[in-house]
């Protein structure tokens, strides 16, 4: 065999080896994830706002549930719920005894006179026979299960330090009242309920987060009678007329001290009004998504201070419903002095925000509770996970 033929054979052999190695390398590349795939796998989820970034996307959230007690923002940021208490597991979906609730039921845990972090053993639909009264230093944590409360709402009356998280509350009725377990002592008489999904009265340090609220007889969330230090965040409001009432009457002067934050919530186009409706107090409404309304989005009377910052308002198509705001109980010369301010809001489909007053000089308490607003055009991303989350232990939520 000549030198020329040997060279051809050597060249062919080297080329064949190179192709085989390249094929094997390709197989390895196919098996090993790309850096982007690895990043996505490690993340498992994306947290889009400051509250969610505090706890979401951590695979050990179920083993470290009470870390959520460090995550509140806004005027309810001092709320820790049952962080320093025991874990109480709801094992029964029954609510057949509202006078002496059985251990293992939600009502039993909610009325204990000690800090508790309440979780759920499995998916549950709990048909409440009466309103669910919750005592101080409690967290009702629905993560890891699909938890629905039906017929009865939650009442927080003269309590402190309560978190309500990841609960779906709907189809709430007016219930007759009677003797109801309301604390660690014997059951006490209670009046007929108002038919609110969540009713907060005379209470402070309250945080309502990642709840889905719909179809109540009265309001979805009512806060009144001197309640303060409240944050309502990451919630989805849907299929209802009146969403959020902050201050129940123009004669309830105790609501002058009320401070409430609404952040990262979605108000769907099936909500008509009160998103929120405010009286007397100081309200920061920040980075919420208003997907049309029937009557108005933000309303009020009795000279409340309302700071609307970085919200997205999409007006309904009807030409006479473009106004975001509704002021009642005063003529224009008076309400034009009320401090209703808009900053970096996004107004779409002809939405109109008629500002009034001037930028208020904030007190130390108000400064301490203010949240940093993101630009309004970021709201779809900030609110994309509003409402109840689907969480599984051992995986990012």
Curated annotation (Swiss-Prot):
PbH1 repeats lie at residues 159-202, 203-224, 227-248. The active site is at residue 274. The N-terminus is blocked. Disulfide bonds join 54-71. Keywords: Allergen, Calcium, Disulfide bond, Glycoprotein, Lyase, Metal-binding, Repeat, Signal. Changing residue 138 to T: Detected only in flower DNA. This is Pectate lyase 4. It is an enzyme of class 4 (lyase). InterPro entries: AmbAllergen, PbH1, Pec_lyase, Pectin_lyas_fold, Pectin_lyase_fold/virulence, PEL. It comes from Ambrosia artemisiifolia. One of its GO terms (molecular function) is metal ion binding. Belongs to the polysaccharide lyase 1 family. Amb a subfamily.
């Amino acid at each position: 065999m000549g030198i020329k033929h040997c060279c051809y054979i050597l060249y062919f052999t080297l080329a064949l080896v190179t192709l085989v190695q390249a094929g094997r390398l390709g197989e390895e590349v196919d098996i090993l994830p790309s850096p982007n795939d690895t990043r996505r796998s490690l993340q498992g989820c994306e947290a889009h706002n400051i509250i969610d970034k505090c706890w979401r996307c951590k695979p050990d959230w179920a083993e470290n549930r009470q870390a959520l007690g460090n995550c509140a923002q806004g005027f309810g940021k001092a709320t820790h719920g049952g962080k320093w208490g025991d874990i109480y597991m709801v094992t029964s979906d029954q609510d057949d005894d509202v006078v002496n609730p059985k251990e293992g039921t939600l009502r039993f845990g909610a009325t204990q006179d000690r800090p508790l972090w309440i979780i759920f053993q499995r998916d549950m639909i709990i048909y409440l026979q009466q309103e669910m009264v919750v005592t101080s230093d409690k967290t009702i944590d629905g993560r890891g299960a699909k938890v629905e409360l039906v017929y009865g709402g939650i009442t927080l009356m003269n309590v402190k330090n309560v978190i309500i998280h990841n609960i779906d509350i709907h189809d709430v009725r007016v219930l007759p009242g009677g003797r109801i377990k309301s604390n660690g002592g014997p059951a006490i008489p209670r009046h007929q309920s108002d038919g609110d999904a969540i009713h907060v009265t005379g209470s402070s340090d309250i945080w309502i987060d990642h709840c889905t609220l719909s179809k109540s007889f009265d309001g979805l969330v009512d806060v009144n009678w001197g309640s303060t230090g409240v944050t309502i965040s990451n919630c989805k409001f849907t299929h209802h007329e009146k969403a959020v009432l902050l201050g129940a009457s123009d004669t309830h002067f105790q609501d002058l001290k009320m401070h409430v934050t609404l952040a990262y919530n979605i108000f769907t186009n099936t909500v008509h009004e009160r998103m929120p409706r405010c009286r007397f107090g100081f309200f920061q409404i920040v980075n919420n998504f208003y997907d049309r309304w029937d009557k108005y989005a933000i309303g009020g009377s009795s000279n409340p201070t309302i700071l609307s910052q970085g919200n997205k308002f999409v007006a309904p198509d009807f030409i006479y419903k473009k106004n975001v705001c509704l002021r009642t109980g005063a003529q224009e010369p008076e309400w034009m002095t009320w401090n209703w301010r808009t900053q970096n809001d996004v107004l779409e489909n002809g939405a109109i925000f008629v500002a009034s007053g001037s930028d208020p000089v904030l007190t130390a308490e108000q400064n301490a509770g203010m949240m940093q607003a993101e630009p309004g055009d970021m709201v779809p991303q900030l609110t994309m996970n509003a409402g109840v989350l689907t969480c599984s232990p051992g995986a990012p939520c």
